[in-house]
């Protein structure tokens, strides 16, 4: 079951990356943290330079610090409720289903959809500045990714001791495409065009996973796959 959860957590990071309220901001945001203008990106492709790559990595480092720290807290809380694993699993499953419906846009609770960001009037200087902006971006997060992140945290809470790996994979799911985008920033049209479908598919997947988790069918599926593939699930 853990292998599937790791795969899904990585996918949740990717879904957060392509959320409609974040995706359109990335070209300008990359220009901001790297100091490269959009005209430079289109004409000279300066994002291939080491300076730009280092700034992007520093941003992702700051981003990662927040979520890995959150994972440590989630792991601690989860260990306190180890004796109530089944109840936590079912409550977590219901929350994941709820977040799936929110992602689909079935309803929009105002408290969850409020946006809280830290804004910089001027970019802090140097690579440390990019780290700080990454931390601010993670701490401020945005409404459309809130339900996805909350689902990951809930899933982590049902698996004491696995919260930090979950959060690391969530960060990787966001970081890998972000790094790729820094090299292929002019190739964003396809994702923009299909972002609504991708988010809807993600919402449906969250609901399905929530149902499987609630009835503990995920474990049965893993056992079945193990029987079919000789002990290797393929995930």
Curated annotation (Swiss-Prot):
* Biological role stated in the UniProt entry: Required for cytochrome c synthesis and stage V of sporulation. Might transfer reducing equivalents across the cytoplasmic membrane, promoting efficient disulfide bond isomerization of proteins localized on the outer surface of the membrane or in the spore coat.
Q: Where in the cell is it found?
A: Cell membrane
Q: Which GO terms describe its biological process?
A: cytochrome complex assembly; sporulation resulting in formation of a cellular spore
* Record-annotated membrane-spanning stretches: 10-30, 57-77, 87-107, 133-153, 165-185, 204-224
- Any Pfam family from its record, for instance, is DsbD_TM
The annotated topology with respect to the bilayer is: Multi-pass membrane protein
Q: Where is this protein chiefly located?
A: membrane
| Protein name, UniProt field | Cytochrome c-type biogenesis protein CcdA
Gene Ontology, cellular component aspect: plasma membrane
Asked if the record carries the keyword Membrane, the reply is: yes
Identify the species of origin. Bacillus subtilis (strain 168)
Q: Which family does it belong to?
A: Belongs to the DsbD family.
Q: Which UniProt keywords apply?
A: Cell membrane, Cytochrome c-type biogenesis, Membrane, Sporulation, Transmembrane, Transmembrane helix
């Amino acid at each position: 079951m853990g292998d599937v959860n790791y795969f899904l957590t990585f996918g949740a990071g990717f879904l957060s990356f392509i959320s409609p309220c974040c995706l359109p901001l990335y070209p300008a945001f990359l220009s901001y943290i790297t100091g490269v203008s959009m005209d430079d990106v289109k004409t000279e492709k300066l994002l291939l330079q080491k300076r730009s790559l280092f700034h992007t990595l520093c941003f992702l480092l700051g981003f990662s610090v927040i979520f890995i720290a959150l994972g440590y807290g989630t792991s601690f809380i989860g260990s306190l409720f180890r004796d109530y694993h089944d109840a936590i699993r079912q409550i977590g499953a219901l929350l994941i289903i709820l977040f799936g419906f929110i992602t689909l846009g079935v309803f929009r609770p105002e408290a969850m959809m409020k946006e809280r960001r830290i804004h910089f009037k001027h970019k802090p200087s140097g690579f440390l500045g990019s780290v700080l902006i990454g931390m601010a971006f993670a701490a401020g997060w945005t409404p459309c990714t809130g339900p996805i992140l909350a689902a990951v945290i809930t899933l982590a809470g049902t698996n004491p001791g696995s919260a930090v790996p979950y959060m690391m994979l969530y960060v990787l799911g966001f970081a890998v495409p972000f790094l790729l985008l820094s090299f292929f920033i002019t190739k964003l049209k396809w994702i923009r065009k299909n972002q609504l479908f991708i988010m809807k598919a993600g919402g449906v997947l969250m609901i399905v996973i929530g149902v499987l988790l609630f009835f503990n069918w995920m474990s049965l599926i893993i056992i079945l796959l193990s029987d079919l593939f000789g002990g290797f699930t393929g995930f």
